[in-house]
Regions:
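C-terminal output helix
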Residues: 108-117, 125
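Conserved phosphotransfer microenvironments
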Residues: 50-70
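Hydrophobic/aromatic residues positioned on beta-strands within the core alpha/beta folds
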Residues: 84-85
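Acidic, metal-coordinating helix/loop segments flanking the phosphotransfer/catalytic sites
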Residues: 29-51, 55-56
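Conserved phosphotransfer cores of two-component systems
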Residues: 41-42, 71-78
Length: 128
């Protein structure tokens, strides 16, 4: 299965998604804030992030997620990025929108997320 980096500032959602992905056979690394993502990129086959992370005032801010997307790509990481957000319109029309492989609106059914992972990652390495 896939090595997945999962990043979300909501610890409850982070743990829940991690358990569901691990139960499906995936290896999951967790990042509870945007600054914790970069060290895991080299070993991740897919990156799944929330869009809104706390800004310097502690308020949820899509600008933090957009900055994270740029940092992921500037690091040289070519892994598919899946954005899961309650506000996908925050990404719409931005340059960062072209840097991600999939945008999914919360709440996301685990079956939909697993399907996206299979399509973006596992499908690329499946025997023909």
């Amino acid at each position: 299965m896939a090595r997945i980096l999962l990043a979300d500032d909501d610890a409850r959602q982070l743990q829940l998604r991690a358990r569901l992905l691990e139960a499906s056979g995936h290896e999951v690394s967790l990042a509870g804030h945007a600054s914790a993502v970069i060290p895991y990129l080299a070993t991740s086959q897919v990156v799944i992030i929330d869009l809104r992370f706390p800004n310097s005032q502690g308020q949820p801010d899509a600008a933090e997620g957009l900055k994270l997307i740029r940092q992921i790509r500037e690091s040289g990481c070519r892994a598919p990025v899946i954005v899961i957000s309650g506000w996908p319109e925050d990404l719409s029309g931005t340059p960062e929108e072209r840097m991600v492989s999939r945008v999914m609106q919360k709440p996301v059914a685990i079956e939909s997320l697993l399907g996206a992972i299979a399509e973006l990652v596992i499908g690329d390495s499946a025997p023909s």
